[in-house]
Amino acid sequence: EVVFTSGATEANAMALAGIRPGDLVAASDLEHPSIRENLTLAESRGARVNRLPRADRGIINPHDWAALCTEAPNLQVATLAGHETGAVQDMAALIDATRRRFGDAGAWHIDATQAVGKIPVDFHRLEVWTLSFSAHKFFGPKGVGALLVRRGVSLPPLFVGGGQQRGRRSGTEAVYLAVGMAKALRMAVDDMVDRQIACTQLREGFLAGIAPCKPWEILGPLAGGLNHVLLIAFSGVRSDMALMALDLEGISCSAGAACSSGSSLPSPALALIGLPEEHRKSVIRFSLGPFLNPDEVSMAGSAVAKIIARLRGPHA
């Protein structure tokens, strides 16, 4: 079943709305704020949330995940592709580890917002209960997303009214937004390989551009992750100072997720991936799109290198 929403934030809230006092939830701090904050809210209402203590380079170890709970969790929550690290989780391995530990895979919610339209995603093969995504991540219209719900799964509505969408989400559906999302998704799937190749070339050009300002470290997976996301720690540089300087050069980037850019606090994911505390305020996240000009991306990389070198000073 497809439930059309205003975006992945609402879809995530809808998927987590059924958490009850006393329920046990398995999760991690790799999640998007729209999941983390809803889990914190559930805790305040009496739910128990066990969070994974470590995920090197943003990749969850199936053994560690299965050991997270001593009893079968009522709900397990994971992000298919990390919005900060770009790490892609092996969901089949995680679900299998849970099944072997507790005899049943249990209920799962997957946030696939960064994955849908960029890598192959098959809801039925994932064997999960719910999956969320948002149209703007694959160049569709803003203000629309969806929650995929396995048939037979009951979820309480976030709000009630006219009972549209089989009572899951009341209110008149924005048909034109849904059609725009469907068209954008079809284009993204049809062009997926070409877009992946383009982003890989952009990534290589950008990394070549920033090479002169080493030391820096890519914090996500070195292979097998999303090729358009780069989370980089520039030692000896405060990210807030770098962001201001980069903005003056017309380079758009962030110290974390774009929708959390108003926060001055380092992302909880940085602790989870093992980054020392003294380096957590030196992290910058770059996102590359398949429609960017390769020459401009390479020039942006060179500009980043010059700015980082300037901020480090002559004795760096």
Predicted regions and their residues:
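Pyridoxal 5′-phosphate
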Residues: 1-316
